[in-house]
Design a protein with these regions (language model features):
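A general structural signal for stabilizing positions within well-ordered secondary structure
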Residues: 5, 102-103, 131-134
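Short, small-residue-biased leader/transition segments that mark boundaries at the very start
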Residues: 1-8
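Active-site neighborhood of phospho(di)ester-bond hydrolases with catalytic His/Asp-centered motifs
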Residues: 4, 13-19, 69-72, 89-91, ...
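Binuclear metal-ion centers of metallo-dependent hydrolases, dominated by the metallo-beta-lactamase
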Residues: 27-40, 120, 124-178
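Core dinuclear metal-dependent hydrolase active-site scaffold
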Residues: 30-108, 171-178
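Active-site-proximal segments of metal-dependent phosphoesterases and phosphodiesterases across multiple
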Residues: 85-91, 111-133
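Short beta->alpha connector loops
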Residues: 18-20, 51-55, 118-121, 146-148
């Protein structure tokens, strides 16, 4: 979490409403708490908040004509190898419902940061593929994959099939120009 010593006074911090009761954040300047369906806008950017299928929320940031989506824990989280068929269906339904909700607002995304988590077992890329299949995504950056770098790399041909550039940031300090 962001501690007061890390809080830069001329910046705004946007957190999910569920974090508003944390003692570590109380009294810090420039904090905005948002929930699914809410947004924040200033003279430089707009942040739309969407849901998650686990903890927190997901964010769509629009700035300088670019849209950047950070999925947080939004994903088709199911462990088919361990879950019942009903649990798999529930996870799939929750995830696809959130994508449907998002499609009412989002037409295209320049950069999407999205989980490709090999801990899910054989379906670990399913949510990511459903995501790039639903939205016109220019660049896909996987997250939640370390240390399974090769598993994350396996998504590159899927992204390409949807006309999406795949960028793997696998080491500390890696960056990409948008």
């Amino acid at each position: 979490l962001v501690g007061s010593e890390m809080c830069i006074r001329d910046r705004h911090y946007i957190f999910p409403c569920e974090m508003s009761s944390l003692d570590e954040l109380s009294g810090l300047p420039n904090i905005v708490y948002l929930d699914r369906g809410e947004s924040y806008e200033d003279d430089r950017l707009r942040v739309n908040v969407f849901g998650s299928t686990d903890m927190g929320v997901s964010y769509l940031v629009t700035a300088e004509g670019k849209t950047i989506f950070h999925a947080g824990d939004l994903n088709n989280w199911h462990w088919r190898d361990e879950s019942t068929e009903e649990e798999v269906r529930e996870a799939e339904t929750a995830y696809l419902s959130e994508l449907y909700y998002m499609k009412r607002t989002i037409k295209s995304i320049d950069v999407a940061m999205f989980p490709v988590d090999a801990r899910l077992g054989k379906d670990y890329m399913r949510g990511a593929e459903q995501f790039v299949g639903e939205f016109n995504v220019g660049m896909f950056v996987p997250m939640h994959f370390y240390p399974a770098v090769r598993k994350a790399e396996a998504f590159a041909p899927i992204a390409k099939r949807y006309g999406t550039e795949f960028v793997l940031l696998s080491r500390t300090g890696d960056s990409v120009i948008i």
